[in-house]
Amino acid sequence: MNRNILNMKPSGIRRFTALARSTPGCNMLTIGEPDFDTPEPIREAAASAMADGLTHYAPNKGTDSLRAAIAAYETNRGMACTMDNILVTVGATGALNTALTGILNPGEEVIIPIPAFPLYESIVTAAGASSVFLDLKKSNFQIEKAALEAVITPKTRAIVLNSPNNPTGCVLSRESLKTVAELAEKHDFYILCDNVYAALSAEAVPDLTLCRSLRDRVILCQSFSKPWAMTGWRLGWLAAPAELIDKFTLLQAAQIASVPTFLQKAAETALEVPVTDMAAVYRKRREYMLSRLDQMGLTYPRPEGAFYVFPDISRFGMDSETFCIRLIEEGGLAAVPGSCFGGEGHIRLSYCYSDEELRESLDRLERFISNL
């Protein structure tokens, strides 16, 4: 067995979700998956594409028409690019895997600001590289120059930025991004931007892809899953310098060949479907959850995007995993321990649930902590 795989850790998110599902009557606030169905025009486009016979191999990079549509989408959002800068992938997970595997050599290092989505560490480990963690809790979840510079070494190959962030919902400030840009140029490493929540953020998100001087070192990962409620479709993309895309394509060709053709046709339609209505629902749910947490006396970093809140539970005198196990067993509610993200002392709550589910779940949380 590959030693790198033996060093990989199972997903704590999946583990606590499975525990909740095996517990009768347990509610869940664990999953970061839109509760909406994929918009009908997208589903109809997929059915039409199959009926039209678009069921054969697609090019390894993706169809020209989808890559051109994605390039136009990114250009409209501020990242000027052409289809030569785009690779269609199997979701953002595929994009992250291809990008990190494509740039890393064994023994090199990737800086991961934490709390962070645990997948980043898993991919880095599988590639035979090392994760170097930059804890943002003491800096109000922003990146400070001295702290970042302290973890940069000659082995540093990349930094992963996820803004809005999973699990906190926090957005990196322009000052944080300026710091990353300056040090990436000084020390010559890539900036991997996981932007899967940007389209659903409540406020405008500062973005390094707008900085022309960084175009040769910024790699953007994006997904159809979150903005268009297409998690099961497994569609995403990479945007990067053309020479990197060419190399990434060789890697993807060896892994999956290509993304299904009829799904790519439906993805073209998705790019034309507004996400403003779903974003408005998420904002409403966010404000409701925050108001309830305020009433419970729980503090949290202010989320400005994504669909998570990361309340502090350290005052209850137990670690986050113990808290979440007891919450399931005694409170009938599942959350994800902050330790799964490198954020001990917190839990992650998702508001990708109906108003009724949120109300009942937060009632359960309130009853649980009132009895501690």
Describe the residue ranges of each PLM region.
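Extreme N-terminal starter segment of soluble prokaryotic enzymes
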Residues: 1-2
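PLP-dependent class I/II
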Residues: 6-8, 16-27, 32-48, 79-372
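A glycine-/small-polar-enriched, mobile loop at the entrance of the PLP active site in fold-type I
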Residues: 27-35, 48-67
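Conserved N-terminal alpha-helix of the aminotransferase class I/II PLP-enzyme fold
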Residues: 57-90
